[in-house]
Curated annotation (Swiss-Prot):
GO cellular component, as recorded: cytoplasm; ribonucleoprotein complex; ribosome
Similarity-based family: Belongs to the bacterial ribosomal protein bL21 family.
Role description: This protein binds to 23S rRNA in the presence of protein L20.
Taxonomy of the source species: Bacteria, Bacillati, Cyanobacteriota, Cyanophyceae, Synechococcales
Molecular function terms from GO: rRNA binding; structural constituent of ribosome
One GO BP annotation of this record: translation
Keywords of the record: Ribonucleoprotein, Ribosomal protein, RNA-binding, rRNA-binding
Stored SUPFAM superfamilies: L21p-like (SSF141091)
Keyword Hydrolase: no
Record bears the keyword rRNA-binding: yes
Protein name, entry field: Large ribosomal subunit protein bL21
Length: 139
């Protein structure tokens, strides 16, 4: 038998980058340049949203675990479309009672694309400037 030598796959650190975030009451494992379906959110198509509830972040070199959230971590997502999921049939039956009930529904979903996952110095912080109004005395 001849030995098959497989060429080593070049690992791209971008392939290893992922984050676990909390969104719409659930936890999602997100990777860059992939799309996911969330529960319907009140955003328009092509809006860019920022998720800051990052529970875990792996950037290919380092693994950061939040307590409960990773500080200064954010995930930017772009809303692609609003859609409906597959039809779900709910069938309830009581045996020997001739009672049957069949209902169905389709879940409202929002499809998003993960644009970037960043932490620390990569994030832009907006500084709030506090302004005070000066009193004008009338004579």
């Amino acid at each position: 038998m001849a030995d098959k030598k497989s060429s080593p796959k070049k690992e791209n650190p971008q392939d290893k980058t992922y984050a676990i975030v909390e969104a719409s009451g659930k936890q999602f494992w997100l990777q860059p340049n992939r799309y996911y379906d969330f529960d319907r959110c009140q955003a328009e198509v092509d809006d860019v949203l920022t998720l800051e509830n990052v529970l875990l972040l792996n950037d290919g070199k380092d693994l950061k675990l939040g307590k409960p959230y990773v500080k200064d971590a954010k995930v930017e997502i772009k809303v692609l479309e609003h859609r409906r999921g597959p039809k779900i049939i709910v069938y309830k039956m009581r045996p020997k009672k001739k009672t049957r009930r069949k209902n169905g529904h389709r879940q409202e979903l929002t499809r998003v694309l993960v644009q970037s996952i960043s932490i620390g110095s990569n994030t832009k912080k907006s500084k709030a400037v506090k302004t005070t109004a000066s009193k004008v005395e009338s004579e």
